[in-house]
Swiss-Prot record:
The keyword Electron transport does not apply. Gene3D superfamilies: 6.10.140.1230. InterPro entries: Snf7_fam. Highly expressed in adult heart, kidney and liver. Expressed at lower levels in adult colon, spleen, lung, brain, testis and muscle. Also expressed in myoblasts and embryo fibroblasts. This is Charged multivesicular body protein 1a. Residues 5-42, 102-124 form a coiled coil. Probable peripherally associated component of the endosomal sorting required for transport complex III (ESCRT-III). ESCRT-III components are thought to multimerize to form a flat lattice on the perimeter membrane of the endosome. Several assembly forms of ESCRT-III may exist that interact and act sequentially. Self-associates. Interacts with CHMP1B. Interacts with VPS4A. Interacts with VPS4B. Interacts with PHF1. Interacts with IST1. Interacts with MITD1. It is a peripheral membrane protein. A motif (MIT-interacting motif) lies at residues 185-195. GO terms for biological process: autophagosome maturation; autophagy; late endosome to lysosome transport; membrane fission; midbody abscission; mitotic chromosome condensation; mitotic metaphase chromosome alignment; multivesicular body assembly.
Length: 196
């Protein structure tokens, strides 16, 4: 399982490198477009522009694939963690069986306490891993941050995108934020329960 996790992370890194290379190639093609236009060679500029767009799309596709592989790696990491917790719970269950067969109430009570602690730890691990997996996917990226980054880049380059951003559905970011807050509150309560 650890080998699989390593391979997934390695593959994600390779895909990210391919995305960066495609982006670099796209910028090189854009420079060729500029040069061709300066030389009044519109036909060559059009070919270079097509290449630039193709390379840019290729880079975005590599990046999407890298994100998906990274999400799978997070799920495998969750499985590895859950395997360890499950093993610990199995050991506690065996100890409980032994204590019950001996009918020593103190041992039974001690084992039950350990078992309850393992169950609470499992809940916390599950919650944390689910949060990390959901944050690894691009679907849970806060829309407000995405919009802010787009506006920042547009302002730096003198581009107009505010009209396009205003066409997004209202409340797109609020749903993600309330979901994250409720998960954080739930996790905080569980952590407080573990401390007590």
């Amino acid at each position: 399982m650890d080998d699989t996790l390593f391979q997934l992370k390695f593959t994600a890194k390779q895909l990210e490198k391919l995305a960066k290379k495609a982006e670099k190639d796209s910028k090189a093609e854009q420079a060729k477009v500029k040069k061709a236009l300066q030389q009044k060679n519109v036909e060559c500029a059009r070919v270079y522009a097509e290449n630039a767009i193709r390379k840019k799309n290729e880079g975005v596709n590599w990046l999407r694939m890298a994100s998906r592989v990274d999400a799978v790696a997070s799920k495998v990491q969750t499985a590895v963690t859950m395997k360890g917790v499950t093993k610990n719970m199995a050991q506690v269950t065996k100890a409980l069986d032994k204590a019950l067969s001996a009918m020593d109430l103190q041992k039974v009570s001690a084992v039950m306490d350990r078992f309850e602690q393992q169950v609470q730890n499992l809940d916390v691990h599950t919650s944390v891993m689910e949060d990390s997996v959901s944050s690894a996917t691009t679907l849970t990226t806060p829309q407000e941050q995405v919009d802010s980054l787009i506006v920042q880049i547009a302002e730096e380059n003198g581009l107009e995108v505010l009209d396009q951003l205003s066409q997004l559905p209202e409340g797109a970011s609020a749903v993600g934020e309330s979901s994250v807050r409720s998960q954080e509150d739930q996790l905080s309560r569980r952590l407080a329960a573990l401390r007590n």
